[in-house]
C-alpha cells in the first residue's frame, strides 16, 4: 500500500499486523450493476469523505476501512493522517491519538487497536492510498 503527499511523491506503508477486516475503500464504482457488479465502496461514505477532507484529499480518494480492530502500519516517513468513525485504541509509538482531526506523524509505527465504541473506522492519509483502479474504483471489496 502506498501514499502520496503530491502526485510526484509516494511512500510505501508496510503492514506490520493486519486487522481482521481491513481493506481499501473509496466511494465505490458506478455503472456496472447491469453486469452484476455491486457499487461497493466505504460503508459510511460520509465518514470516509470527512477523513479525506481533514487531510486535504478529494472526497473520493482511497482510505483504509477497518472493522472491530485495525492494523498496525509502519510509516516510512512523516505523513498527515486522520481517523474517523468509531473511536479505536489508536496509538503512534505508544502515544494515544485523537479521532476526527488531522494529525502529522513522523516515521514510525501506527497501531489501530480494538474499538472503544462503534464498529468501523476509516484512516485517511494525505495524498490517498495508491492502489490499482479496477472498473474505476480503488475499493478492494
Residue ranges and their predicted role:
Residues 1-141:
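Conserved "landmark" site that anchors the functional core of diverse proteins
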Amino acid at each position: 500500500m502506498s501514499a502520496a503527499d503530491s502526485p510526484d511523491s509516494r511512500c510505501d506503508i508496510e503492514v506490520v499486523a493486519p486487522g481482521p477486516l481491513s481493506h481499501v475503500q473509496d466511494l465505490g464504482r458506478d455503472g456496472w450493476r447491469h453486469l452484476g457488479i455491486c457499487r461497493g465502496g466505504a460503508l459510511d461514505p460520509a465518514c470516509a469523505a470527512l477523513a479525506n477532507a481533514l487531510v486535504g484529499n478529494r472526497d473520493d480518494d482511497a482510505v483504509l476501512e477497518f472493522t472491530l480492530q485495525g492494523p498496525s502500519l509502519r510509516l516510512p516517513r512523516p505523513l498527515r493522517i486522520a481517523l474517523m468513525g468509531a473511536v479505536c485504541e489508536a496509538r503512534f509509538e505508544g502515544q494515544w491519538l485523537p479521532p476526527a482531526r488531522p494529525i502529522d506523524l513522523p516515521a514510525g509505527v501506527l497501531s489501530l487497536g480494538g474499538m472503544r465504541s462503534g464498529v468501523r473506522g476509516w484512516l485517511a492519509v494525505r495524498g490517498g492510498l495508491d492502489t490499482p483502479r479496477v472498473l474505476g474504483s480503488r475499493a478492494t471489496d
